[in-house]
From Swiss-Prot:
CDD domains: TilS_N
Catalytic activity: cytidine(34) in tRNA(Ile2) + L-lysine + ATP = lysidine(34) in tRNA(Ile2) + AMP + diphosphate + H(+)
A Pfam cross-reference name: ATP_bind_3
Annotated gene: tilS
Record GO biological process: tRNA modification
Job description of the protein: Ligates lysine onto the cytidine present at position 34 of the AUA codon-specific tRNA(Ile) that contains the anticodon CAU, in an ATP-dependent manner. Cytidine is converted to lysidine, thus changing the amino acid specificity of the tRNA from methionine to isoleucine.
Protein name: tRNA(Ile)-lysidine synthase
Single GO MF descriptor: tRNA(Ile)-lysidine synthase activity
Length: 338
């Protein structure tokens, strides 16, 4: 594999600061050396879950590798995870990455997901019953609120990485062979055989499906004002809500998506987000941390302007920061201008 195979994903990385999620395994080790070979500047971040026998050796190796190539190496020692390991480990990992991104102004988070990872996810979601958006959840370039996730290896089979990394030192994670994890069951019983015999066709199918997704889920103009994100209602509304919340660092579950549809886009999610709609728009906002008592005149003006009830506390909290007589009118006008 050469830069030609993933060059489309390298160009954004040539500007701004980059952070590579590193584990010491085959995938991230291979990506580390590919990025070095392409003169992409980046630092690395590693999470120690205290689950691997070679954990201290992995940490020392990561630090030495970073030092050799003049890169920063951030390490997070995660607390013990008692249950739901995969889900909790993912949360710990992404929280750590996002903390570093905010503190050090990284523009891109580089992850080493490859074609086998994508197929395993696809098969798992297919078995549960999922739409195209969920089946293709992994994207090579994924914009978040203040940074972008870049996955340069998303169309690269794991066997290709093994060939590339044959002279590199990397560590096998023992948990990858444990069948108590659902992903490993799908890998052993289904994905490995499919990749062994049909990898070229699988690559092409994912490329076709990605293009179909772009056509089926066109991006809708999104605006933001006074801490509220909003867009015009359409048949893609749930897709847009999912995409916006991902940018804000929150991933909706299947049940939450069903709940949003059941409540017709008027509810609270995870006691953290407000989702609301009017006749033409869908709104997303962080729920205010404190319940504020709104004066009667503010409530009356919001009611006369047909501003949905769930949004009024959000707007009032913002109004207190910048009180102006036309505060609500300007917000209403921004909806009309969308």
């Amino acid at each position: 594999m050469t830069a030609r195979d993933f060059k489309n994903y390298l160009e954004p990385l040539r500007e701004g600061k980059n952070l590579l999620g590193f584990s010491g395994g085959l995938d991230s080790t291979c990506l580390f050396h590919l990025l070095v070979g392409e003169n992409i500047a980046f630092d690395i971040a590693l999470v120690d879950y205290s689950t691997q026998k070679q954990r201290l050796e992995i940490i020392q190796h990561a630090q030495k590798l970073a030092q050799t190539h003049h890169k920063k190496c951030y390490i997070h020692y995660a607390p013990k995870i008692a249950r739901n390991f995969e889900m909790q480990a993912r949360k710990v990992r992404y929280d750590f990455f996002e903390t570093l991104i905010k503190e050090h102004s990284y523009k891109h988070l580089i992850l080493a997901h490859h074609l086998n990872d994508r197929l395993e996810w696809f098969l798992m979601q297919l078995s549960k019953g999922a739409g195209l958006n969920t089946l293709l959840s992994f994207q090579a370039y994924e914009k978040r609120e203040s940074y972008a996730i870049v996955r340069p290896l998303l169309y690269t089979p794991k066997d290709t990485l093994k060939t590339l990394a044959k002279d590199q030192k990397f560590f096998e994670d023992d948990s990858n062979s444990s069948l108590k994890f659902k992903r490993n069951c799908f890998r052993k019983h289904y994905a490995n055989a499919l990749m062994q015999h049909y990898s070229k066709g699988i690559i092409q199918s994912f490329k076709f499906l990605d293009k179909e997704k772009e056509r089926l889920y066109p991006l809708i103009p999104v605006s933001q004002m006074h801490g509220i994100t909003f867009f015009k209602h359409s048949h893609n509304a749930l897709f847009m809500v999912d995409k916006i919340l991902k940018k804000k660092g929150y991933v909706l579950s299947f049940l939450q998506k069903e709940e949003i549809k059941h409540h017709f886009f008027s509810l609270e999610i995870a006691q953290k987000f407000i989702i609301e709609k009017d006749k033409e728009h869908v709104f997303i906002a962080f729920k205010p941390q404190k319940t504020l008592s709104m004066p009667k005149d503010f409530k009356d003006r919001a009611r006369r302007l047909d501003i949905p009830k769930r949004l009024r506390p959000v707007l009032y909290a913002e109004f207190l920061k910048q009180p102006t007589h036309d505060f609500l009118t300007r917000f209403k006008q921004s909806l009309m201008d969308l």
